[in-house]
Amino acid sequence: MIARWFWREWRSPSLLIVWLALSLAVACVLALGNISDRMEKGLSQQSREFMAGDRALRSSREVPQAWLEEAQKRGLKVGKQLTFATMTFAGDTPQLANVKAVDDIYPMYGDLQTNPPGLKPQAGSVLLAPRLMALLNLKTGDTIDVGDATLRIAGEVIQEPDSGFNPFQMAPRLMMNLADVDKTGAVQPGSRVTWRYKFGGNENQLDGYEKWLLPQLKPEQRWYGLEQDEGALGRSMERSQQFLLLSALLTLLLAVAAVAVAMNHYCRSRYDLVAILKTLGAGRAQLRKLIVGQWLMVLTLSAVTGGAIGLLFENVLMVLLKPVLPAALPPASLWPWLWALGTMTVISLLVGLRPYRLLLATQPLRVLRNDVVANVWPLKFYLPIVSVVVVLLLAGLMGGSMLLWAVLAGAVVLALLCGVLGWMLLNVLRRMTLKSLPLRLAVSRLLRQPWSTLSQLSAFSLSFMLLALLLVLRGDLLDRWQQQLPPESPNYFLINIATEQVAPLKAFLAEHQIVPESFYPVVRARLTAINDKPTEGNEDEALNRELNLTWQNTRPDHNPIVAGNWPPKADEVSMEEGLAKRLNVALGDTVTFMGDTQEFRAKVTSLRKVDWESLRPNFYFIFPEGALDGQPQSWLTSFRWENGNGMLTQLNRQFPTISLLDIGAILKQVGQVLEQVSRALEVMVVLVTACGMLLLLAQVQVGMRQRHQELVVWRTLGAGKKLLRTTLWCEFAMLGFVSGLVAAIGAETALAVLQAKVFDFPWEPDWRLWIVLPCSGALLLSLFGGWLGARLVKGKALFRQFAG
């Protein structure tokens, strides 16, 4: 009986929309849940390889031994590293090297790539970067003097797992064993060194140790993991993750709305059937069995189809994201399935319980009186309760993210606008005198049922707003990535350029038709005072290390001025706005620096917005020309070259002390990552658009049912098919235009919060929204309305349906 009734009811368009909306909700949560779960497991494994540890502690001096012993007591593996710069010698040839001394456990995770393969820094031997070997004309098996120690060269170090990217690292790498550091005599009290301690273990061990350690850290010490990475790739991937979360949120919101509209419409369309069944003797228990059984079959079918679609989406996304994921991802846990099925159940209960209760409570009297509706769970109580429950569940699912609050803020603004603009529209229409008959009929229809008009306006506006949000943000992400990696980005850095080499280097590059980026002088100094107040004790990382300063007459293109005036004059400086906010520095304040030779001061006269994600030189402070002349300085520049290694070899021979840094591989990796992620985002746009179209169809279908009886009356009074179709077209076009206008205001509100607080984009009003949304809304709804209307007014079908 239940199966037969379900199969007969299955042909109802409303029930089909409910099934599709629930299926898409399951698919969205399952696909993103599975990918997130697998990526979290796989990337946590990969991230430890990028760091050669699960966590790291950085310090300018050796930490107490008790800290390391405590870590070992808790079951953590502990590794030590020490980095410093010192002079090395091959015979009488000197060369500054960046020394990295490691213990026997290094690397804790990941691979140290060497030539020959499989080498590790053993006591008495060193590994040299190929550039250092070339500069000193050395080969494997030779010896090199590092300070007071003479060590054997075991091979070349090609790639370190935890090397990172630093264009200001002036000297080539030399890797040695920590046991040989004392023999070199290079590290003395007061020497500038950096200690890094790597820790490995499970999350419980790491979290426990972190809670024990953090209260004891000093300002110059930093505890971090890979999630603190703020590089170009790290920030881009974070934005991509936020976009995927936003896609999931919008899909769920649209699915909830579509199920609510379609479920309500389906149950209303079955009031007469239930009333007839009751008059024929059907008991409450029998009807409950039929209705609940049918509902369970819809949920089961939605779970099966949604699960299949979700797994398909997961596989598509995994193929698209394959180049940016670890080679082998572990399987997902059961949690995504529980979340997906739980989401489906909660959505169905929240929006389906009241319509089904109303259906079950239908009175037999409705057979005689069409306006009899049971009074169950008044909307004035039910809607606020459902809204609060939905927000709490979404907050739990999204982790209280700013994404959720921004979208909800946009929805609230949109709801208020719908009320205000809707009433304004109705009042304007009431006063208008129209000559066109279809327009007059359309306007009279909208005025006759104001609450129905406002509810349709709200649903259409919500659909358009959420779709606009997604499409605009996707465009912003892609634009941002293209700005970050323009086609002519420099792929080589030249660093450690002496002042006397600048002119001959420019001539060399010009000879090879190379146009370099700006030449930046680099001076290392420590910020020691702000308005004559010492900065000691301040925990900001920028105050606990030497900063790279520069002077420029021309403002860098990627550093727009946000306050003050450019260029700085004598005894003035331009400061990065983020650091100024963190240190509470305002225009007119004085900052004091200690360089290698002397102390110097400057007044802050401008603040710049610095794009730290760009693979270009960036500086906290830019001085005017001549301000840093008393300090030792080197220079750096960058250029693009794609014509082979001949020029690069000639450059190395002619300027052996200049370091050449090839970032082409980094650019290629970032470009591939962003290309693949953008494809994955397109898949999510398709998913959200499908949900949006379902909501539009559901709402248009509801509108058509309300118009059905009126169409019969008009047709009986002699109205032609063309007039009816034109009337429907005009009515839906007006609804679509106003919905698009309201959606544009709501979308701008949400975008202002999302762009500024979540995606870290500068917010700018998008004029295209104000044109595209109203026009698209009018076009889409007139097409949907016209298509369904054409089916309604076709021949005798209109009367046949009415009679039925």
Curated annotation (Swiss-Prot):
Compartmental location: Cell membrane
Q: How does it sit in the membrane?
A: Multi-pass membrane protein
Gene Ontology CC terms, in alphabetical order: plasma membrane
Keywords in alphabetical order: Cell membrane, Membrane, Transmembrane, Transmembrane helix, Transport
Its domain of life?
Bacteria
- Transmembrane annotation, as ranges: 15-35, 243-263, 301-321, 333-353, 381-401, 403-423, 453-473, 680-700, 734-754, 769-789
Query: Where does it mainly reside?
Result: membrane
Cross-referenced InterPro entries, in alphabetical order?
ABC3_permease_C, Membrane_comp_ABC_pdt, YbbP
Q: Which family does it belong to?
A: Belongs to the ABC-4 integral membrane protein family.
Q: What is this protein called?
A: Uncharacterized ABC transporter permease YbbP
Please state the gene responsible for encoding this protein.
ybbP
